[in-house]
Structures are given as C-alpha cells and as structure tokens.
C-alpha cells in the first residue's frame, strides 16, 4: 500500500480532538489537515474525575498541566485545522476552543471554527448528519 505523505489528515473528537490538535501543532510539517471536535485544550478545565485521576490536581502538578496544554502550541499551526464544538457542551466546555482560538489569534495562526448552537458534546439526528458532511467536505477541500 502507498501513503501520500504530503496529504495526511487526522480527525478526532473529545480526547481525539485533543490528539488531533496536538498532532497538528507538534508535527506541523507532517499533518496537512485536521478536524478537532470538542477538543480538550487545557486539562485544568476538564472534568476533575478524569484529569485528576491521571495528573493529580493542577495545584500539585502545575508542570504536568503546563506541558500538556495546547495553548503554547498554537503558534506552531501550519496546516488547515477545523475546530468544532457544541455551544452547550457540558463535557468539554466551549472555553477550551475559544481559548485556543485566542491563542491562535495572538500567534497569528489561522484555524477554522464552527459552532453548533445549543448542542451538547455529541451531535444527534440532523446535527450529526450535518457534522459528518462538514468533516468529509473539509478533507475533500483540503486534502485533494
């Protein structure tokens, strides 16, 4: 099998959104296109039951939280990154996306952003169809 290394894309939701954004900003010369849905951007804003289970508290592990934050990596973005969130997401609150967007603005990088008004962490029904069409179209537009 052949992989065109000039046209690699990555997609994920929630932790997968974190990984997508992390890959796009850690390996900006490897990944051309990414779609990050409901991405965790800074673990100090995520649910304590999950983050603190693995990382302890932000107060007791400030270095770990700082190292895993995607905010400082916003300056590294080169490819096309679509960030998507549900505006009523109680799991990965929109603050994650908005803070990353602010960091990108300050760094002069240009991600794309799409919001589903009134939607929670996972899309259902017509919104889910729209979401998957949007993701597919993004890869069609930027990986061909």
Regions found by a protein language model. Name each.
Residues 1-144:
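Active-site-proximal cap/loop segments of hydrolase catalytic domains
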């Amino acid at each position: 099998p052949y992989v065109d290394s000039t046209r690699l894309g990555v997609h994920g939701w929630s932790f997968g959104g974190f990984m997508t954004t992390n890959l796009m900003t850690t390996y900006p010369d490897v990944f051309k296109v990414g779609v990050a849905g409901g991405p965790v951007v800074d673990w100090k804003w995520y649910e304590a039951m999950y983050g603190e289970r693995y990382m302890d508290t932000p107060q007791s592990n400030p270095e770990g939280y700082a190292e895993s934050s995607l905010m400082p990596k916003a300056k590294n973005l080169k490819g096309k990154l679509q960030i998507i969130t549900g505006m009523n997401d109680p799991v990965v609150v929109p603050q994650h996306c908005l803070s990353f967007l602010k960091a990108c603005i300050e760094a002069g990088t240009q991600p794309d952003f799409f919001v589903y008004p009134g939607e929670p962490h996972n899309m259902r029904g017509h919104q889910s169809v729209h979401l998957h069409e949007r993701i597919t179209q993004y890869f069609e537009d930027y990986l061909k």
